Amino acid sequence: MSVETYLEENYPAALEDLKAFCRIPSVSTDPAFIDGIHQAAAFVAERLRKAGFASVEMLQTGGHPAVYGEIIADPKLPTFLVYGHYDVQPPDPLEKWQTPPFEPDERDGRLYARGVSDDKGPLLIPILVAEAFMRVEGRLPVNLKVLIEGEEESGSPHFAPTLEKYREKLRCDLVLSADGAMWRPDKPSITVASRGLAALDITVTGAAKDLHSGRHGGSAPNPIAALSALLSSMHGPDGRVSVEGFLDGATPPDPRILTAIDASNFDSAAYYREIGVSAGDPINTGRELLIRQWLEPTLEFNGIWGGYQGKGTKTVIPNTAGAKITCRLVAGQKPDTVIAAITRHLQQRLPKGFQLEIHRHGPGSEADFVDPDLPALKISEEVLGELLGQKPLRVAMGATIPIGSAFRKHLGCAAIFFSFSTADEDYHAPNEFFRLSNFKLGMRAWTMLLRRLAAA
């Protein structure tokens, strides 16, 4: 029996494993889900043991545990480290899910559940492939280490210290990330760059308590009004960030990615139809849209609060209002510099009568890139090209996968993104799904990849 045949025959069991994994509510940002975090870590550890990883352990990180496993086939063989994460985004808003987020639902060739695409489905694939090699051939063609963290969706605040602490254990020739995404379902792609991240909350306070809007209206400071003015000052008419110093250090984009954008023939009108924008297209060309998504920094408002939120009306002037902000960074930008620029901008524009509080979430991460001449990158392209019948595009990712720069800094090695989710699968949104055809494709691809890397 071949490895490929084993995977085909055991696909039903693999699908049940994925469903069981997705039933675990492993939300990393909310302490209410801490039991789910520990259950998910235990699930991954047990699945590694079942796959034949002789050494499996929980690594203490100072936060949620990371799961580590290894199979050393031969010290003379190259060693690869598979990266993924078992934590997921919060499922809110729950009312927009067609089925409960932690009750996996299979329909129309897709599996719907929170975390199924980001990253439980993709990270399970290399584990299943390793198991197939062990069951069929009794060994792997390469040495394989696995590191699955539990804080990626929280910005990986303890990831860099964990790499430093366990540097010798994690030492490898190359990282293969199961996290990431194909750009589009109809075009094979490999991500060669991703944006960095800086996140913060801002809170504006006026009076010491909520006030009656009749008695105090017109004279008391209203934090919602002040907050709204501050937020609106952070972008220009074209939607680009207008915060002074925000762009400090930013470098020009890689011309090879611009070439990929030109070759993509991206349809901006179709994109806006897909996401449900019906009031006209804010950006008229696919080229400009992708440049903004991939190669320009952003400052987005993720949440806003203040005052009465219940049904009906309440005549109140709230004493506080706030917003959640995340910034995506391009090459050359530093999270510390970006946060400092935003802080200065807000403090300079804060109206009299208000106090401003800024809470930063973690250290953030810098943008990342892959050496375009890396041999493993070319091997990955060859594998996808053979399986899908067309050469994959080298694309950038507007999102953030902070592991690339962290692995380069602390382990001295590069990371290749070899994931089989696609960017349209609604991760971070209601009704997240994973194409089961990609679940199968990923198993074939990882099998080929490990063999090709062993022969390189």
Residue spans for each PLM region:
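Active-site metal-coordination/substrate-binding segment of hydrolases
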Residues: 77-148, 441
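A common structural junction motif
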Residues: 86-87, 234-238, 343-353
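A short core secondary-structure module
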Residues: 161, 217-238
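Flexible glycine/proline-rich, aromatic-decorated loop/lid segments
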Residues: 189-205, 416-420
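An extended, acidic, His-containing surface patch that forms the Zn2+-binding/catalytic region
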Residues: 184-185, 242-320, 328-341, 349, ...
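Acidic, glycine-rich active-site loops and adjacent beta-strand->loop/helix elements
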Residues: 86-88, 147-155, 178-182, 206-208, ...
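N-terminal helical capping/dimerization or prosegment-like subdomains
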Residues: 1-94, 320, 337
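Acidic/histidine-rich catalytic neighborhood of metal-dependent amide-processing enzymes
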Residues: 117-193
